[in-house]
């Protein structure tokens, strides 16, 4: 396969599909699996048939025991690549069109209780240089339901603190307005006082959250911050920044928020994505059985 096609595909993902750098890298990494298979079998991805692709799927998924989510991600990348080839007239027909996506098991997300989030907040050492920053990060993730990529990419020029909202650049460069909670606003204001004392590196001035060297935080840094706080707070769950987003949505729903409002706050295109938060907790199920089952009402 010619390098010119790969460069054109990269441009297509970046500009026409408006994908983030991380998403582009993921698509290209999965395409590399197809290229490796083709090299091993003397094939060219551009001229592959449906039967060739089926063999690739079997070889990659069945024999390696790849889980369903990984299968779906790789197939999505394959579909995207062949749509690009068809759209740009490199091929006359899409051989991936009949490849079926695996059925996805919908996982119930890990959610922290209000008490667990409070424990994480209390585990923050505010005497450390990064303490107030970390407190503001927790409040932003939990109080506004931001994705970790949205948090690290948050810019001061998109924050309207006097009006209590911020402009968020979501997936596919889609923008949405998100309210800033009073607590998040207060803690962010305190972080801004600390931020003034940093030596901010050129080109980093507009990023809301910086490390001690004045550079934009990375997603990996946020993961590390949260997991250390979780460990310090004695929380046994395996969490990520997305856990706070899940907790934000779940707690809103439990307290009566409309699902459509939650959908808008999270930036979900399809409400079926938001509907996963309608799951009932194990505690709620147990409470319902204890309250309503006749065997428990005899006592």
Placement of each model-derived feature along the sequence:
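Conserved catalytic core of the tyrosine transesterase superfamily
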Residues: 1-299
